[in-house]
Amino acid sequence: DVSELMQNSKAHLGLMFANMNIPDYADLCFVGSVPFYAVAHPKHALAKLPAITVAQLISHRQILLKGLNGRQLEQFSPMSAQVWWANDFYLIADLVLQDMGWAYLPCHMVEKDIKNGLLCKLPLTLDHKPWSAPVDRIMRKNQPMGPALTWLAHEIKMRFEQRG
């Protein structure tokens, strides 16, 4: 979605999950990664298991992210035979909070809900550490940069650097 906005000159700067298909109009800068937890409602069947294999995920509804254009993002592949799609992590979190399925969500979005017992971090055997998705800052090549855009481009890099 962000790449298309850049291509159509509807945005000057964006953040997107890294993609191996680098558009020729794009100036990309890797800024960091976003860690994710697999989560479910505490009453969900998966939340009661001490360790969860990929085979055990197949029969439980997974809620996954798709772009506004309806395309599946390469970083978010289905692990379940039953998938619901949403185009917003906040919507996915709401569905998981209502015990509609399980999902991978950014750690910073769900840590408070996990701490408060509203969500349960799933002990997936394939996740020794939180899974992280690389993030790129995207800008159009050779676009003129005024002081505000220069500041914002730099500030985004610094914010990701501060997060570790």
Feature names for model-found ranges:
Residues 1-23:
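Central regulatory/effector-binding core of bacterial HTH transcription factors
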Residues 14, 82, 141-142:
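Glycine-centered flexibility motif
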Residues 21, 25-100, 105-130, 150, ...:
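C-terminal regulatory
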Residues 39-45, 134-145:
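A bilobed periplasmic-binding-protein/Venus flytrap-type ligand-binding module shared by bacterial periplasmic
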